[in-house]
């Protein structure tokens, strides 16, 4: 993405979370440390089943008198439902505000430019993952997972065109954003196909800053920490690129007649649950492999050493 390009993500949902016990409520159920969230820091996080299986992922930022949760729009109501399940008598409000807000993607370079504008004079905020600008009507934050995904402007829908004009931005297709995310090894579409099927940590949340292993208890904290600290993580979600044929969900991926993984998300961008040990992932990364009746290769995200 060039510095003056922008992408409107109209497939993102938003949940406003407030109330006297909003902070403690979130701290007890999500994987990241809510205490670290400030007006200048946004976090990526998730919620697991009691067995440690993946459910949903989202961003959490300070917002008005509480927090704003950003997620895949089609799971907004499901997230509210699971949060309500754990709410019990807790003093917290959960409101779907997806019809009020939108997500405007800008480059990290544009974020840097914004911090240097006259009304931001004196600001020393670095362009690091999660760095957040709290303006009067908008929140602007660098993607907490990987700053190569740029920054997000969270704004009221009716202000979208004014922001684009004010920042001298040109809209491009959102496929550019999702293709970049695919190459970086970060799935963002059709994540419901992972729900309750993989351990949360297998979706690379540890590598993407989505889990704080030093915070107190959250749902399935003990098992998740055990997998990480005892080096028991044997599979990860990785991008799978088609060489020939078609890729389908549950297709088996083989290397030298050994089953090393299977497709868990087939469209629009394919991801597989892939072994990282026995055999070592370095043996088969970026080489031609069989996948059902097709040929594929597993891409190497930058965080794989």
Ranges and model annotations:
Residues 16-22, 36, 106-110, 241-248:
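Short, surface-exposed ligand-recognition loops at beta-strand->loop->(often short) alpha-helix junctions
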Residues 1-57, 61-64:
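Acidic, proline/glycine-enriched N-terminal capping motif
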Residues 3-9, 13-16, 59-184, 255:
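Acidic, low-complexity central loop/insert segments
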Residues 40-41, 114, 130, 136, ...:
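Glycine-centered loop/turn motifs
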Residues 149-239:
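Anionic-ligand-binding alpha/beta catalytic cores of soluble enzymes and soluble regulatory domains
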Residues 30, 73-75, 83, 229-231, ...:
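A short beta-strand motif that forms part of the nucleic acid-binding face
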Residues 49, 74, 302-304:
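N-terminal auxiliary interaction/assembly segments of multi-subunit proteins
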Residues 54, 203, 208-211, 221, ...:
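Glycine-rich, small/acidic residue-mixed loop/short-helix segments
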